[in-house]
Amino acid sequence: MKLNVLACCLSLLGTAAFAQKNEWRDPNVNEINRAPMHTNYFAYEDENSALKGCKESSGNFMTLNGNWKFFWVKNADMRPTDFYQVNFNDKGWDNLKVPGLWELNGYGDPIYVNVGYPWRSQFKNNPPEVPTENNHVGSYRKEIMVPADWKGKEIFAHFGSVTSNMYLWVNGQFVGYSEDSKLEAEFNLTKYLKPGKNLIAFQVFRWCDGTYLEDQDFLRLSGVGRDCYLYARTPKYIQDIRVTPDLDAQYKDGTLNVSLNLKGSGTVDLKLLDKAGKEVATSSVKGSGKVSTDMAISNPEKWTAETPVLYTLIATLKNGSNTTEVIPVKVGFRKIELKNAQILVNGQPVLFKGADRHEMDPDGGYVVSPERMIQDIKVMKEYNINAVRTCHYPDNNLWYDLCDKYGIYVVAEANVESHGMGYGDKTLAKNPLFAKAHMERNQRNVQRGYNHPSIIFWSLGNEAGMGPNFEACYTWIKNEDKSRAVQYEQARTSEFTDIYCPMYRDYKGSEEYCKGDIDKPLIQCEYAHAMGNSQGGFKEYWDLIRKYPKYQGGFIWDFVDQSLRWKTKDGVPFYAYGGDWNKYDASDNNFMDNGLISPDRKPNPHMHEVGHIYQSIWVTPSDLANGVVNVYNENFFRNLDGYYAEWELLANGEVVQTGMVKDLEVAPQQTKSIKLNYSTEGICKCKELLLNVAFKLKKAETLLPAGYTVAKNQLTIRPYNAPKLDLQNVHQVNIETVIPTIKDNDINYLIVEGENFRMDFDKHDGFLCRYDVNGMTMLKEDGKLTPNFWRAPTDNDMGANLQNKYAAWKVSGVAVQHTLIAEVPAQLQVAPVVHGPPYPAGAAFRCIAV
């Protein structure tokens, strides 16, 4: 008994001492006791459950979502340090739902900054140190009941996303620590739990040393952003399972390598099912630790964004004849290659019609529901977006599942951005203190997402400079995963990126690169900035992309406006952006709203331009007089037999004929001439004739209904001819009867009067300041008719500071000189000489005789 008491005391002392350490300021400590990362899967009790794929229905699953006791403090040094004790009294604490973010529930304010850290208004960067003041801390407590039938099993806690870090305790004992806000943290709780009631407690800091690597251009929020749960495993289980599909040189037959890491020994039976559930291949491996096997598949259906066909691998772990657990894994057969300065998917140089997407919801912030994710993919499909970059961090696991299912190419980015440190000598890419964090974040991104066929590229991070830390990450990934390309924008065209993926390379620079001899494909990771009134020059980008083989597309910044749904003091709802919450936090104002769609997912006007330019069916003239057009199929894998065409003939804007082509057989990357049965006979030759052709789905698919228009084109059969002005029959006026009079006796104004009008010119600046016609005043009082060389700046103008660069053009009375010569008798010819300020002495209108 004395030994037990002593052991207990030592344990408590160790826990208390540990809790006083500063892991949140130590870049060498990014985790303590965190379970190794593995691919995203869930182990079910039997095959039927595995095929249904609903982990929430499994007896091995228990949610931690819902209400937690919650206590928030403004400053880190005010945080409670004993709240995790079992006998701690939390009756005065609030309730907060998990997942849920503090700032959206009344605890602190959101911060939006683009470049620079959220503390930039109060604290000078000094990595790894972060502020104590305004470093909010949230403490959580929850009592749970462990199911009785989990006895003898290993029990893990899964925290999907916690910003910016977390300390975890169970029943008063310290369990572990984790950083990296956008990847799950899992902990083995087996030795800390007891039968029946248990206390789980964790503490989260708004900022930690890891925040230096999370300086992304988005809302800075805190708390729990994704689902949290417990799951149970038998003592012997599959720790990890990786699938690597491949195709032969002809892109016909496939192989599937399955690599497993077994805890304990056992036999794993493998079978591959096609989309109809038919078994197409089997294998079996036996052993412990790391084992692998290859499966051959004859001519499998291939996965692409155009044809997202998925197979299902069923991995059954057995102990003798008894099933221990069953893991389902979705498999897509596709091959990624770099050849001749192009990225090939299944042998084809696909075009990436992409957008950058932040994980953001107007009501939940980082908490994005499955329904919202599906809505986002539906919008992408509606507007012909076929690729997404997970800017600038790993997304919810479900997002990749949905991209696999519905067909979206993914650039999977690691949670590394240190933009606020700049790109020079201070960049964290060159700082050895942060080498471990760079590596771990990239490793865990790959280890978790490896099985997703939608992931085409890995991205090392975003706007974080370049240096040895990224070089090491690139080398590790290329050794770990030889089936994908790796990109990083700051690597430029060096050997540490497979793709040249610049930001906002203009037309000239893009074309110069395409004409050069660098053997890397050009795919802009950000381009065509979609803020406000934008995309006016989008077609010009795609003229180049469609012209040069190694220019393979880009990702528009960005997909969705990031504003939050907020309310005024009077309860009126509005979309809030940076600066709306308080006057003291740093803010980059509305620069967070750069989306193709609004926060509620309604398309912004410029989205329609994107949808058109991104379409993959194009019509060009062939013999329009006889109704013949060329139809080009820009798809790489899909025939047009799943679409039909509708056409309409317009005469001066009015529809006069319509028709349909039901059968379109146009192979990928091919052009075919088709006949449209319209006739121009009987239509006045004075009328403009236009031909509209739209392509629509025959059947519902990938979230789109039957009849949905995926592409539309307009051709001119007969152009509009403006009526000619008949100058031969102009009404003749007797100039002797309409000669105006000029009064120059006013000190300020030159007055010109006629029978039905009066015009006053200001002698100081030469501008028309009064104009009356038939007794009606045409200019408001004190108004002047002045030249205007200005328009309201757009958001993108202001982003480039053009409103200041070109401010001179906004000034009324900008330096202008012009001469007016009227065809009137010599004594009345007027030549105003107008100078911009400062005006020369005596400058005014003057009458001249010629």
Q: For each of these PLM feature ranges, what is it?
A:
Residues 20-54, 173, 209-212, 218, ...:
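Extended substrate-binding grooves/exosites of carbohydrate-active enzymes
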Residues 20-158, 208, 212-216, 221-224, ...:
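Extended carbohydrate-recognition surfaces in non-catalytic/accessory domains of CAZymes
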Residues 22-39, 53-55, 175, 195-232, ...:
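Glycine/proline-rich low-complexity spacer/linker segments in large multi-domain proteins
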Residues 23-31, 69-73, 101-105, 109, ...:
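Accessory beta-strand-rich segments of carbohydrate-active enzymes
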Residues 104, 113, 161, 206, ...:
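Beta-strand/loop-rich accessory regions of lumenal/periplasmic or secreted enzymes
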Residues 194-197, 259-337, 684, 692-737:
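Extended acidic/polar, glycine-enriched regions
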Residues 235-264, 605-642, 731-748:
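Surface beta-strand/loop "capping" patches
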Residues 284-299, 653-685:
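Intrinsically disordered, low-complexity Pro/Gly/Ser/Thr-rich segments with frequent PxxP/GP/PP motifs
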